[in-house]
Amino acid sequence: MTRANARELAVHLIYGREFTGEEPEQIVATRLNKEYYGLLAEENEVYSDRPSKAQMQYIDCVVSGVANRTEELNEQIQKFSIGWDVARISKLTRTIMQLAIFEILYVADVPTGVAISEAVRLAKMYDGDDTGSFVNGILGSFARSLPAEV
C-alpha cells in the first residue's frame, strides 16, 4: 500500500466520524480490523492491500490529529475560503482540506506541495474537477501565508 492509499483511507475514516461520532481510536480499530477490512476490499480497491505498520501509525496520527484539531483546521479553511462559509463546504471536501492542513502543519515527512497535490487529487476523484480547483485555491493561499520554514 502506498502513502497515497493510506491518505485516502484516512480521509474515509475522518469523513466517517462526521456521521458516527466515534472516537478516533475506535474508528481506526473497527474499520481497519482484518474482518471489516476484508469486507471493504470487495467494494473499494483502496482496501485491497493492508496498511503496513508505518502506514497504520500515519493513519492513527492523522485521524486523531484532525479529530483533536477540527476547530483550528476549520478556522484556517474559513480564513482562506473567501465568500464561503465553512459550513456550506461539503463534508467530504472539508475533510480533505482538514487532512491537508493538518499534514502541512504537523506531519514533518509530508512536504507542503505533496499535501496540496494529494488533496486536489482526492477532491477531484470524489467531488469533481471544479472542487479540485477550489481546494487548490484555498490550500495554496493557506500555504503562502505560512512562514518559510513550515
Question: How should these model regions be labeled?
Answer:
Residues 1-132, 136-150:
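N-terminal interaction/assembly modules
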